[in-house]
Structure formats: structure tokens, C-alpha cells
């Protein structure tokens, strides 16, 4: 789970540097959040099965 959290922080940092235009920033952040959420959900489902 630490790796996912670290990836999220890095992605946010990158989004701030790359997506400087106001139109791109929310779209990029939304994609990152959805991607991170999906990964977290997968991890939780794997834990539940054990």
C-alpha cells in the first residue's frame, strides 16, 4: 500500500508540472485519482479473499 501512496504523490507532483493549463489539470488529476482508486480497490479485494 505504501507503493500506491508513493505513486499517487509522484503523479500529483508530475501533474502540477505537466498540466499547468487549467483545462488539462482537472482532467489529468481525475485520471490519476481513478487509476489510483482502481489499484487500491484491487488490493482491498485481494486482501478480502485471503
Swiss-Prot record:
Q: Which residues form a coiled coil?
A: none
Q: Which cysteines are joined by disulfide bonds?
A: 33-40
Kindly list the residue ranges recorded as spanning the membrane.
none
What compartments host this protein? Answer: Secreted
Gene Ontology, cellular component aspect: extracellular region
Sorted keywords for this record are: Cleavage on pair of basic residues, Disulfide bond, Secreted, Signal, Toxin
Q: GO terms for molecular function, please? A: toxin activity
Question: Which residues does UniProt assign to the signal peptide?
Answer: 1-23
What does the record say about tissue specificity? Answer: Expressed by the venom apparatus.
User: What protein family is recorded?
Assistant: Belongs to the caterpillar 9 family.
Question: Briefly, what is this protein's role?
Answer: Probable toxin.
UniProt protein name: U-megalopygitoxin(9)-Mo13
Origin species, per record, is Megalopyge opercularis
Amino acid at each position: 500500500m505504501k507503493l500506491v501512496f508513493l505513486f499517487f504523490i509522484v503523479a500529483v507532483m508530475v501533474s502540477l508540472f505537466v498540466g499547468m493549463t487549467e483545462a488539462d489539470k482537472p482532467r489529468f488529476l481525475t485520471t490519476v485519482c481513478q487509476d489510483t482508486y482502481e489499484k487500491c480497490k484491487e488490493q482491498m479485494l485481494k486482501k478480502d479473499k485471503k
